[in-house]
Amino acid sequence: PIPSRGLGDVYKRQILLTIGFGLLAYSLSTFADERKDRSLIFWRSLPVSDLTTVLSKVLLVVLVVPLMVIPHIILLQLVAMISASIFFTTNDIVSFGWLWGSYILTDWFRIVFSLWAQALWSLPLFVWLMLAGTYATRPIAGAIIPPVVLIVLERIIFKTNTVLEFIENRVGFWSRADSFPKEYNEIRVVDISDIFLLFSSQAFWIGIFASMVIIAGIVYVLSL
């Protein structure tokens, strides 16, 4: 299983970064673009609640997009495995059967689980960007200025960096290190068992609660 796991881990950061930037851009622009082209008025004329509209966009970010990358994952890993097979076979480094005896299919799903875990971990950022797109004339400024003000005020008044640390943690990759920094300090593709670890993390549920509050704010702004 070593070759396949190694290839999967190599893909992890590239895939997470690519999808992550795409989701951040989508989250920031989705409601902002609808306000600009007036399509928001059309959607509000449909018999669909604002909450349903917001949740559909959140589910797209968290669940649907990770599934859309499966074909790309399969293609990339097959190309890498074929290339490695040719190289190893011609150089008598490792047997062809041992290389393809790795858990390729398992790795594909592990990467998808990694994307799901990361999307849930970074959900507060996604919904915050959506909120900025609903009320701010300049969404980028609306997304950046309020957190900066909170960070500065917290530092001046309380001499702490809770807000800054929260944002830094959500921007970074989630790993076992976020729950057990001493015992598990590696960054790797998430195993299915890590999902249960994520769900048992207090920091995860704090993020989910913050996301729910922000989603409520989005629904309120849309209803105005």
Where are these regions (language model features)?
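Membrane-embedded or membrane-proximal helical elements that form or frame transporter/channel pores
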Residues: 4-36, 185-209
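Secretory targeting signals
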Residues: 5, 9-23, 56-130, 134
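Helix-loop-helix units of permease transmembrane domains in multi-pass membrane transporters
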Residues: 30-60
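Hydrophobic/aromatic residues in alpha-helical transmembrane segments
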Residues: 24-27, 39, 128, 218-221
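Central hydrophobic cores of alpha-helical transmembrane segments
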Residues: 126, 140-153
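Junction motif at the cytosolic side of a transmembrane helix
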Residues: 129-141, 193-224
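Residue-level hotspots within the lipid-embedded alpha helices of multi-pass solute transporters
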Residues: 30, 115-122, 207-211
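Juxtamembrane non-transmembrane "cap" segments at the membrane-aqueous interface
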Residues: 82-93, 160-185
